[in-house]
Amino acid sequence: MIQSMYPIQKVSRSEFVPIRQLNYHVRQWGTPDKNIPPLVMVHGWMDVSASFQFVVDAMTQDRWIIAPDWRGFGLTDTPNQDNYWFPDYLADLDFLLDHYVGDRSIHLLGHSMGGHVATLYAGVRPERVDKLINLEGFGMAATRPAQAAGRYAKWIDELKTMHKGELDLKPYADLEGV
């Protein structure tokens, strides 16, 4: 058994929920309270719901918190495709909210990519989001249409290199170089 160096203060509950042909892993803290909107926390790219443990432990108010692992991350199934589309994240979130909260409004917190998804979702379903917290979710990088062909060509080349097993990660001399 792996022992954590961090002393967890509020233990989460884990469960799996069928969402859009995937077995979604969802972590929860606290108990549902009809007087307090649930807090839904969505993580960023290459992250997991357990990363919110530090935030949950720092909260002084006991409340119901729902944090899924996005498709392909953590313990949630990986779809049978090699890409992830933002509309899928929006739909997954909508189905998860149907399952857990029905027509109740929520407080929605997203970090990084999750912040971008949360902001998009609040725009698509404003009636479901009572409060929005966006942590470092700056959105997609700004590019010009004229850059598209070159960016796609580079992406295809990198994809082929990866599939051949020849992808080398770029080394950095120090933190400044990153």
Where are these regions (language model features)?
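Active-site loop/oxyanion-hole signature of alpha/beta-hydrolase fold enzymes
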Residues: I19-L22, R27, D33, A67-L109, ...
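Flexible "cap/lid" loop of the alpha/beta hydrolase fold
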Residues: L120-G123, D130-D174
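Alpha/beta-hydrolase fold catalytic core
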Residues: M1-L39, T60-W64, V101-R104, G139-M140, ...
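A conserved amphipathic alpha-helix that caps or lines the catalytic cleft of carbohydrate-
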Residues: V56, L97, Y121-A122
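Conserved G/P- and acidic residue-centered "switch" motifs that form tight phosphate/ATP-binding loops
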Residues: G72, G114, K131
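Conserved HGGG/HGGXW glycine-rich cap/lid loop of the alpha/beta-hydrolase fold
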Residues: H25-T78
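Core-facing hydrophobic residues within beta-strands of well-ordered domains
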Residues: D103, R128-V129
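Gly/Ala-rich beta-loop-alpha elbow adjacent to hydrolase catalytic centers
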Residues: G110, G114, A118
